[in-house]
């Protein structure tokens, strides 16, 4: 009897929930990226949604990359989001770094023209051993490049650039006089603050519901 009551109560609670659609922000096309069950709109706010970047850009070479969106508010059953970061799968990164290759990591807090701050993590893989001088030069050029690019764009445009196709060729071009790099990736980004809204942690979770909704 107790088991039957528990099952009945669970079914009734499930029936009380509503299906919500989750949209990418306008600067990424306002596409529907996921659907999720919630008790009400308040239960949806602050959930984090993970979406393949290939679905946003149409570039299926980016199938290893995931974008993260946080739900900020709901209008009816439509949930609005902001981009809070992205990442490339660890397995893909490990495949890049093989024997007789060197890895150079660059991590910078990038400030955009509208005073948002996003941490950008770049990984560079060389085809062979490089001198410490070359490593220093590569780090400096790419650091200057990404910081200056951030200052030239508002957050919305910088996000599109960050997950788009042009950034790879631009980084290759920026370093071509130092070393003929072939493998550079922005392996991860994390929003720190959005135009005055401080301390946005990509990993924080809404305690009342499932924290990550996967498409």
UniProtKB/Swiss-Prot annotation:
GO cellular component: ribonucleoprotein complex; ribosome
Keyword Hydrolase: no
Single GO MF descriptor: structural constituent of ribosome
Signal peptide: none
Superkingdom assignment: Archaea
Keyword vocabulary terms for this entry: Ribonucleoprotein, Ribosomal protein
A Gene Ontology BP annotation from the UniProt entry: translation
Name of a matching Pfam family: Ribosomal_S3Ae
Presence of keyword Transferase: no
Family membership: Belongs to the eukaryotic ribosomal protein eS1 family.
HAMAP family listed in its UniProt record: Ribosomal_eS1
Name the UniProt record assigns to this protein: Small ribosomal subunit protein eS1
Native organism: Thermoplasma volcanium (strain ATCC 51530 / DSM 4299 / JCM 9571 / NBRC 15438 / GSS1)
């Amino acid at each position: 009897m107790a088991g039957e009551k528990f099952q009945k109560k669970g079914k009734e609670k499930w029936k009380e929930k509503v299906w919500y659609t989750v949209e990418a922000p306008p600067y990424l096309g306002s596409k529907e990226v996921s659907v999720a069950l919630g008790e009400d709109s308040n239960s949806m706010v602050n959930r984090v949604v993970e979406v393949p970047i290939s679905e946003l850009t149409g570039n299926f070479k980016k199938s290893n990359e995931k974008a993260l969106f946080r739900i900020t508010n709901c209008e009816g059953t439509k949930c609005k989001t902001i981009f809070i970061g992205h990442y490339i799968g660890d397995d893909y990164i490990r495949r890049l770094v093989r024997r007789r290759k060197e890895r150079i990591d660059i991590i910078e807090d990038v400030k955009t023209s509208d005073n948002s701050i996003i941490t950008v993590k770049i990984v560079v893989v060389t085809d062979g051993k490089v001198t410490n001088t070359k490593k220093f030069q590569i780090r400096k050029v790419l650091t200057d490049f990404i910081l200056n690019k951030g200052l030239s764009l508002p957050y919305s445009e910088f996000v599109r650039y960050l997950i788009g196709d042009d950034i790879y060729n631009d980084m290759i071009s920026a370093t071509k006089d130092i070393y003929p790099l072939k493998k550079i990736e922005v392996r991860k980004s994390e929003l720190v603050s959005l135009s005055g809204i401080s301390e946005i942690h990509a990993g924080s979770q809404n305690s009342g519901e499932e924290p990550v909704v996967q498409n």
